[in-house]
Amino acid sequence: MGIIQKGLVGLIGKDYYIRHLSIINPFLPVELTPKEREVLGTFMSFRGDVADKDRFSTYFRKEVKEALKLSDGGLSNHLKALKDKGAIREELNGSITIASFLLPAEKQQFYQFKIVEG
């Protein structure tokens, strides 16, 4: 089998980030569930100064809950699981950040990997 190449064009907003997380998920130390990828991808999709300062603020949590039809408890459970898996972490100042190894390039992301038998 030769090299497999596939380009994905037209992924917008959270779909871009969810697809990115789905592609890298098998390579993570602890895989994220589909819903965890959806929650994190939605948070990753927010833009602007406010999002850059506090992406997990009450305002953005409300947006995620509405977009994904989650209860307060449901979102809290997913955020706890993401913390436990190292995908997000709480900083000394109390803000929550996304692990840098999960962040894709903004407009397009390239992937390259190889599997070797034996």
Each model region followed by its residue ranges:
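Short, conserved sequence motifs enriched in acidic/basic residues, glycine, and aromatics
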Residues: 30-31, 69
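Short amphipathic alpha-helical interaction segments
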Residues: 69-84
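Short helix->loop/beta-hairpin flanking segments within DNA-binding domains
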Residues: 32-60
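Long, low-complexity, charged/polar intrinsically disordered regions in eukaryotic proteins
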Residues: 1-28
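A short, conserved structural fragment
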Residues: 80-96
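Short helix-coil junctions and helix-kink-helix linkers
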Residues: 59-73
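Short, amphipathic alpha-helical interaction segments positioned at domain boundaries
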Residues: 103-118
